Amino acid sequence: MNKDVSLGQPIVRYEDGKLFNTTDQYVTEFPLTIMVNGEEFATVICSPTNLEELVIGFLASEGAILKRDELKSVLIDDSKGFAHVELNKDLGDRFQYSTKRMIASCCGKSREFYFQNDAAIAKTSMSKITLTPIQIINMMTRLQSASHIYQETGGLHNAAISDGLTFFVHRQDIGRHNALDKLYGFCIQRHITVRDKVLIFSGRISSEILIKAAKIGVGVILSKSAPTTLAVTLANDLNITAVGFIRNGGFNIYSHPERIIDSEQ
């Protein structure tokens, strides 16, 4: 299986009243089956990059691990599309439902008892970070220009973690949840504290994305799109500042505006 994030493929295009042969970039979908302690845990449809980060972040998001020390080993066999994970503990009965799930690239899991299962992992933010409007606009501009593949295909989600000035990590994936899990895995691997960091995201802030941000532990999430009503409710409850519709030099603050300060003051 080809491991490129995107591939040039021949197509027929219609333009200016004519049909002609050309090439176009397609994003790659890669099925990765995650085995935990020898048992099939889930299959994730993803972009074939930063797979170890993805696996670690996904397991942390699911509550299977809470810290790096719980991982004994992670072996990625990308030639066969498997990730073999050994933990220093048993998963326990509550993860029996998780076996043999297929997590599509286009959407969340839409699983039963979603909020009950995630409530124990999502964190109420204690972040003290503050941002100026210029910082917010600059971070979104940088995110949008960071990926040439997104500019070529329009088919990848981009996400980054920043302190307001510097991007600590930038990741991309065909799945919006995967992009965030890669960030999460990166931070867990390196023991990076994200409480006073910002999550910058190219997609819409849905309730699932907001909960994912809470699991990662950030206090601010920025998006070029608007959030959903449930996402705003959760952001208020979890003390997360949600900023959306960042474009053309403006933006909307949907929750906890106290973290955004006027640069003129």
Curated annotation (Swiss-Prot):
One of its GO terms (biological process) is Mo-molybdopterin cofactor biosynthetic process. Belongs to the FdhD family. It is found in: Cytoplasm. Required for formate dehydrogenase (FDH) activity. Acts as a sulfur carrier protein that transfers sulfur from IscS to the molybdenum cofactor prior to its insertion into FDH. The keyword rRNA-binding does not apply. HAMAP family: FdhD (MF_00187). Pfam families: FdhD-NarQ. This is Sulfur carrier protein FdhD. The keyword Chaperone does not apply. SUPFAM superfamilies: Cytidine deaminase-like. The active site is at C107. One of its GO terms (molecular function) is sulfur carrier activity. GO terms for cellular component: cytoplasm.
